[in-house]
A protein has these predicted regions:
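Long, hydrophobic alpha-helical segments
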Residues: 53-73, 108
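Terminal transmembrane helical anchor/hairpin motif
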Residues: 162-236
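Hydrophobic alpha-helical transmembrane segments of multi-pass membrane transport/permease proteins
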Residues: 17-38, 54-63, 168-172, 222
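Secretory targeting signals
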Residues: 35-37, 43, 58, 100-160
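Aromatic- and glycine-rich beta-strand/loop motifs that create alpha-glucan
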Residues: 1-21
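Hydrophobic/aromatic residues in alpha-helical transmembrane segments
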Residues: 63-67, 115, 147-148, 226-227
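Transmembrane helix boundary and interhelical loop/hinge segments in multi-pass membrane proteins
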Residues: 47-50, 66-84, 98
Length: 240
């Protein structure tokens, strides 16, 4: 098995033994369920785009909470040096931690599938294609936010600070697509391309655009590599 996948499997299993993980899952699902109850079920609306948009907003807090301890916790406990001396490349370690956190996100999204099922049961009706692309878009956006969270966690041993850094960076790329009323249209047309909303919107409309897939993949790779470079530079400083 690929070393990164082995690391991911171990990290994912450990996360599922933590009460904190289930608390975070519960808060996210409760918030999402409340939105579904107030919109789709209460108003009889079959379109889940509004719910997906709210879930995207919740990611700003949910994903940093999942990732804040991925590296920062090990640094604070003094086990990071031990991990980095294992017969694994730093890239395998970082990608393993990323995949584990992304796996947690996929797990909670799988649990949230109960909401479109409830909408269908109560007779509102849903579009399976739009549900599929909506969840695919959330997974792609979630990958980018997860990579940002891993990078933030690599910067410090303080988990709260890692959460704040991840939240701040994520909020910036989230808000770039929502500045239309504050800046000139020509400037906004350029800036909004770097916002997650711009690329998630196609998925929520039921369209899979390879350009959006590439953008999310690029953001994910950039921040995972930044986390790797951060750990490499730290190791070099310690060797000196």
């Amino acid at each position: 098995m690929n070393p990164a996948l082995t690391m991911a499997k171990k990290e994912y299993s450990l996360s599922l033994r933590s009460l904190g993980t289930y608390i975070i899952f519960g808060v996210f699902l409760l918030a999402t369920g409340t939105m579904v109850a107030l919109t789709a079920l209460r108003l009889g609306v079959a379109d889940m785009r509004d719910t997906f948009s709210r879930m995207h907003l919740f990611f700003l807090f949910f994903i940093p909470a999942l990732t804040m301890g991925s590296i920062a916790r090990e640094r604070s406990l003094g086990t990071l040096e031990l991990v980095t001396t294992l017969p694994l490349k730093l890239g395998h370690i970082v990608w393993g931690k990323f995949l584990a956190a992304w796996g947690q996100l996929a797990t909670v999204l799988a649990f949230s599938l109960v909401f479109p099922v409830l909408i269908a049961i109560f007779g509102v009706g849903v579009d399976p294609g739009a549900i599929f692309t909506g969840y695919l878009g959330l997974l792609c956006a979630g990958a980018a936010y997860t990579a940002i969270g891993i990078f933030a966690s690599s910067l410090t041993e303080n988990q709260v600070l890692a959460f704040i850094i991840a939240l701040a960076i994520s909020a910036v790329i989230f808000l770039l697509g929502r500045l239309g009323e504050l800046i000139p249209l020509k400037v906004f047309a350029l800036i909004e391309y770097f916002g997650t909303d711009y690329h998630l919107d196609s998925f929520l409309k039921g369209v899979i655009d390879t350009r959006d897939l590439i953008w999310f993949a690029a953001v994910t790779f950039i921040f995972v590599l930044l986390a790797q470079f951060r750990l490499q530079s730290e190791n070099l400083n310690q060797e000196r």
